[in-house]
A protein has these predicted regions:
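Core subunits and conserved enzymes of cellular information-processing
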Residues: 1-211
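Positively charged, small/polar-rich N-terminal and surface patches that mediate targeting and assembly
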Residues: 23-27, 55, 117, 158-161, ...
Length: 284
């Protein structure tokens, strides 16, 4: 019970950190530099910019982003995971609040620097939310749903969507803004990949003398399937051992090491990154 309470409060804190960081990235770096974000936020930016330029009407970006997230959050509630969606809702609401109360101001005048610093802040904040078992809303929800249902990524669709937004922004407002926007999204994506270890799969081969004790503990704690290979022999010791074959998230490795050491401190573990799986891999 205590662990669940700590986990719940830590996720709320992380949602707040995300909202603050992404609002700083947006209001201090991207918006003053006319740099367009990716996903729903970038689409809303483009629509607001077009309306302001051709109609003269100023609209609230945070409010429109919140409105566009509502149907996506409903989809997430029913089709992904309600616990996941609860904290995603918190992140989306806090982001709307922070983006509204933090003033837009120019911190740097170099647009390339603004794109890169904003990208690092944005990507890092997105990565920590995904690592904590919830998302930032928007197109992330669609991507997670498709990956959960089919095991496939729709990254190419996201790239096409973002390219369309940035192309239109460049065509209407100037091609330099399209370049800065693409740079910002690229840096943000690299930061997400660096921070978000939960969705990076690794293959683990564990050679042990204590498979009977290890298997139930690992399955209960990590919620991962394990394949046991019997009757293997070490070339040096000539002793019979067993191999445990596991596919897990990179995030699981620290906990996995702790569990193994408590049962078999002489176990040998080999880790291989960059593993692709089908739909039978648990994420949320």
């Amino acid at each position: 019970m205590l662990k669940k309470e700590i986990d719940r409060h830590s996720k709320i804190i992380i949602a707040g950190i995300y909202a603050f960081m992404v609002s700083i990235a947006f209001n201090f770096f991207w918006l003053p530099g006319n740099i367009y974000a990716s996903g729903v936020t970038g689409f809303v930016q483009l629509i607001v910019s077009i309306i302001e330029r051709f109609v003269g009407l100023s609209l609230s970006i945070p409010f429109l982003v919140l409105c566009m997230n509502i149907p996506l959050l409903i989809i997430s509630w029913f089709w992904i995971n309600r616990e996941f969606t609860k904290y995603t809702i918190v992140a989306v609401l806090l982001t709307s609040v922070f983006m509204s109360i933090i003033p837009v101001q120019t911190v740097v005048t170099d647009p390339i620097l603004a794109a890169m610093v904003g990208g690092v802040l944005h990507g890092t904040s997105v990565g920590i939310t995904l690592n904590s078992d919830f998302s930032t809303g928007g197109l992330d929800i669609i991507g997670i749903l498709v990956r959960k249902r089919t095991g496939k990524s729709i990254g190419s669709i996201f790239i096409a969507f973002n390219c369309t937004v940035h192309f239109l922004a460049g065509f209407i407002f100037g091609w330099q803004y399209a370049f800065y926007s693409v740079l910002a999204v690229f840096v943000s994506g690299k930061a997400v990949d660096f921070v978000n270890t939960k969705q990076q799969k690794v293959q683990i081969l564990l050679v042990t003398d204590h498979s009977e004790a290890l298997v139930p503990v690992l399955q209960a704690d990590l919620k991962r399937g394990i394949t046991v290979v019997n009757n293997v022999e070490g070339a040096f010791s000539k002793e019979e051992k067993k191999i445990l074959f596991i596919v897990a998230s990179k995030k699981d490795l620290g906990r996995l090491n702790q569990l193994i050491k408590t049962i078999d401190h002489q176990a040998f573990m080999s880790v291989s990154p960059g593993v692709t799986t089908n739909t039978n891999f648990y994420e949320w």
